[in-house]
A protein has these predicted regions:
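Short, well-structured N-terminal submotif of metal-dependent ribonuclease cores
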Residues: 1-39, 54-68, 145-148
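Acidic active-site catalytic centers that drive phospho-/nucleotidyl reactions
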Residues: 5, 108, 126
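Conserved beta-strand segments of alpha/beta enzyme cores
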Residues: 36, 78-80, 136
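Short beta-strand segments at enzyme active-site cores
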Residues: 38-41, 124-125
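Ligand-binding beta-strand-loop-alpha-helix segment within the catalytic cores
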Residues: 73
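Active-site neighborhoods of divalent-metal-dependent phosphate/nucleic-acid chemistry enzymes
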Residues: 79-123
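Acidic, PIN/NYN-like endoribonuclease modules and their adjacent C-terminal/linker elements
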Residues: 112-149
Length: 149
């Protein structure tokens, strides 16, 4: 199962971002497929937070548009809500300790632990995720072209 990062969904939603076309096409392929895909509520809340932020965008998205984008994904029959389970904290702690995660990398470790716990492939443009042992991850375009990291 795949699990997209915040950046992938923000890029798919916002037409004014250079990676929009790649991410929109990738997301359309995911939605049109019958394969299960995961969504983290923490990722979706960050999508709403970022896309509606006047500091991030000269013309931020309306709150109802951002929620509509997220809800369109959540209502797909093959969408799986992915939340931390019993093993998440121990995986998260291990990743933080092993990689000396600090600051914003702690959040990255939290998401990496979520993907590892669920056995998901993390889809992101952030190559810093390569630092987390045991995490399977891909860049959207690379995944579409069959390349692996």
């Amino acid at each position: 199962m795949i699990l997209p990062d915040v950046n992938v969904l923000v890029y798919a939603f916002r037409r004014d971002i250079p990676q929009h076309a790649v991410c929109r096409r990738w997301l359309a392929d995911v939605v049109e497929s019958d394969a299960r895909f995961g969504l983290s509520p923490a990722v979706l809340s960050a999508v709403v937070r970022i896309t509606t932020n006047l500091r991030a965008f000269k013309m931020p998205s309306a709150v109802d548009e951002a929620f509509g984008f997220c809800e369109d994904l959540l209502c797909q029959p093959h969408c799986q809500i992915v939340e931390p389970g019993d093993r998440h904290w121990s995986i998260f702690k291990r990743l933080c300790v092993e990689t000396d995660a600090r600051g914003s990398r702690v959040t990255d470790a939290w998401f990496a632990a979520l993907a590892i716990e669920w056995g998901c492939e993390w889809i992101t443009f952030d190559r810093d995720f390569a630092r987390f042992p045991g995490l399977k991850w891909q860049v959207p375009a690379a995944r579409a072209e069959g390349q692996e990291n």
